[in-house]
Amino acid sequence: MASSEFIDPAKLDLDDQVVAINRITKVVKGGRRMRFAALVIVGDRKGHVGFGTGKAQEVPEAIRKAQAAAEKNLITVPIVGTTIPHEVIGVYGGGKIMLKPAVEGSGVAAGGAVRNVMDLAGVADVTSKRLGSNTPVNVVRATFEGLKQLKNAEEVAKLRGVSVDHLAE
């Protein structure tokens, strides 16, 4: 299972990717008040990935806040070779993401935010389908819900109380 135990971001060489920046307008008595919201994904391309959101009056500050939030929200993704261990569906709100393992060399068949998550997680071969909501925040959250459900063969064998060899039969 993709563990959500605390992962120290200082020990990892993290890259980041800004997925979305939204301008938010609040109408007040004196006119319109503008703010910005940023969605950022961070990862080390070796099985650790996280996402975060940040809001501020200026875009760079919103991105900085989102990066800090993403580093606090890291998960570990089990990777088998260059792909994920099994098919999974992640759901968050109206967003649904189906992730399927792919043969080596097929690449990341995913669009937008899902591709960014997979690249930063270090998954080189995967197929995905986005169902339902396609807003970037829902897509990223649904992708993370799916990644959290992943288990490798050792974890499944341990949960069932059998050997890994017995699972392959």
From Swiss-Prot:
GO CC terms in record: small ribosomal subunit
InterPro entries: Ribosomal_Su5_D2-typ_SF, Ribosomal_uS5, Ribosomal_uS5_bac-type, Ribosomal_uS5_C, Ribosomal_uS5_N, Ribosomal_uS5_N_CS, Ribsml_uS5_D2-typ_fold_subgr
GO MF annotation: an example: rRNA binding
Biological process terms in GO annotation: translation
Keywords: Ribonucleoprotein, Ribosomal protein, RNA-binding, rRNA-binding
Any one Pfam family match given in the protein's UniProt record, by short name: Ribosomal_S5
Keyword Hydrolase recorded: no
Residue ranges occupied by any S5 DRBM domain in the UniProt entry: 14-77
Source organism superkingdom: Bacteria
Subunit structure, interactors included: Part of the 30S ribosomal subunit. Contacts proteins S4 and S8.
Written domain comment of the UniProt record: The N-terminal domain interacts with the head of the 30S subunit; the C-terminal domain interacts with the body and contacts protein S4. The interaction surface between S4 and S5 is involved in control of translational fidelity.
Family the UniProt entry places it in: Belongs to the universal ribosomal protein uS5 family.
Protein's job: With S4 and S12 plays an important role in translational accuracy.
Protein name: Small ribosomal subunit protein uS5
Native source organism of the sequence: Limosilactobacillus reuteri (strain DSM 20016)
Lineage: Bacteria, Bacillati, Bacillota, Bacilli, Lactobacillales
